[in-house]
Regions:
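Conserved active-site regions of diverse hydrolases
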Residues: 2-375
Length: 375
């Protein structure tokens, strides 16, 4: 019963701004992009909030590859995958929500490094998903004031909504909190993690093999043997299985619901174990960090330990630091999401941005309400 209630709560939240398909608005070749998530997609929102060094990345060696003039707050040696997606969609780089005077008409990036779905994940240090969703409502109001109601609703209905979040709920929540382990079996915990608002077209980055991060290898009781921390990876697999079930159900419940779900676990696991096959030299150790596998997160010397090692060429590495991949992996993620059929489905992101299906304002206003799903 708890799992069923969580599922319907997810559906209700989705339907709160869910939009239904039809065919009447003028054709437009590019949709706006709205991004919700964590450090995998954060463009620098954490620069603007009161947080700790561990939740920021606006100093070197972050951003060292020179694409940006200075470190931006991205947890990478350069760009993150949503920057590439914007490029492929013929959009400018999507601005952080907290960036002053940002142009909102091409979309907004709400992602915050360290964030989770659950408010207690890194509480007080990040912008959790529920707060990100409230910020989206502010953007809706702002766009309506700027563009007028009809044009704003048309823009939002055509937009693609990308969600990359949940790792921190496990890394900073479930694994480190015995009470969470007691009260939440993985499937129920996953249900709590799947709270979302959105529209009709979604992109999802499902969970990576968490136990293979340099951080988790270093925490593995058998770290001397070099293996992944299977307890963490098992949670990721449970999450991905639950996500697949929920998305399949939503596709049946919501007419016109379309999504791109990236099988990130197997995709990244293959690169970690076979780096040379994908143009890398190192799949286990981080380019930047200290301790076993570079798994101790030093924040560029901003917190203990102050010392860290930095590789000569991040392009040879899968892992940039103890948590995060390099820009080169981010670029491969984006290319896969955009065009690669075997690892994504049932749609590619390119399909979601450039399909010819249109929405009418009448159908937007006539979206189903939550009472249809009361149980």
């Amino acid at each position: 019963m708890a799992r069923l209630n969580l599922f319907y709560l997810f559906v209700t939240l989705l339907l709160s701004i869910s939009l239904r398909p039809c065919y009447g608005l003028p054709e437009k070749t590019t949709s706006a992009l709205f991004i919700f998530g964590d450090s995998t997609a954060d463009p620098g929102n954490n620069n603007y909030i009161n947080t700790t060094a561990g939740m920021r990345a606006d100093w070197k060696p972050y951003g060292q590859n020179g694409f940006f003039e200075a470190p931006t707050g991205r947890f990478s040696d350069g760009r993150v995958f949503v920057d590439f997606i914007a490029e492929y969609a013929k959009l400018p780089i999507i601005p952080p929500f907290y960036q002053p005077s940002a142009d909102l008409t091409n979309g907004v990036n709400f992602a915050s490094g360290g964030a989770g779905v659950l408010p207690q994940t890194n509480q007080g240090l990040v912008v959790d998903l529920q707060t990100q969703l409230r910020s989206f409502e502010e953007v809706q109001k702002s766009l309506t004031e700027k563009l007028g109601e009809a044009e704003a609703k048309a823009l939002l209905s055509e937009a693609v909504y990308f969600i990359s979040v949940a790792s921190n709920d496990y890394l900073a929540g479930y694994l480190d909190n015995p009470k969470m382990q007691e009260y939440f079996v993985p499937e129920v915990y996953v249900g709590m993690v799947l709270y979302e608002k959105g529209a009709r077209k979604f992109g999802f980055l499902n969970m990576s093999p968490l136990g293979c991060m340099p951080l988790m290898r270093a925490r593995n009781p058998k770290s001397s043997e070099g293996g992944c921390f299977e307890a963490a990876s098992g949670l990721a697999l449970a999450h991905n299985n639950a996500l697949n079930v929920v998305l399949t159900s939503l596709e049946q419940l919501l007419k016109g619901f379309k999504y791109c779900n990236f099988k990130f676990y197997t995709w990244l696991y293959d690169r970690i174990n076979n780096p040379a096959s994908y143009g890398f030299k190192e799949g286990v150790n981080a380019c930047y960090g200290t301790g076993p596998y570079g798994g101790v997160y030093s924040c560029g010397g901003k917190r203990m330990p102050m010392e860290f090692q930095l590789c000569d060429n991040a392009d040879n590495y899968i892992w940039w630091d103890s948590y995060h991949p390099t820009e080169r992996i981010h670029e491969q993620i984006a290319k896969t999401l955009w065009k690669d059929g075997p690892s994504v489905g049932p749609y590619k992101l390119e399909d979601l941005f450039f399909n010819k299906e249109r929405l009418t304002i009448a159908d937007i206003l006539d979206a189903p309400n939550e009472e249809h799903f009361q149980h």
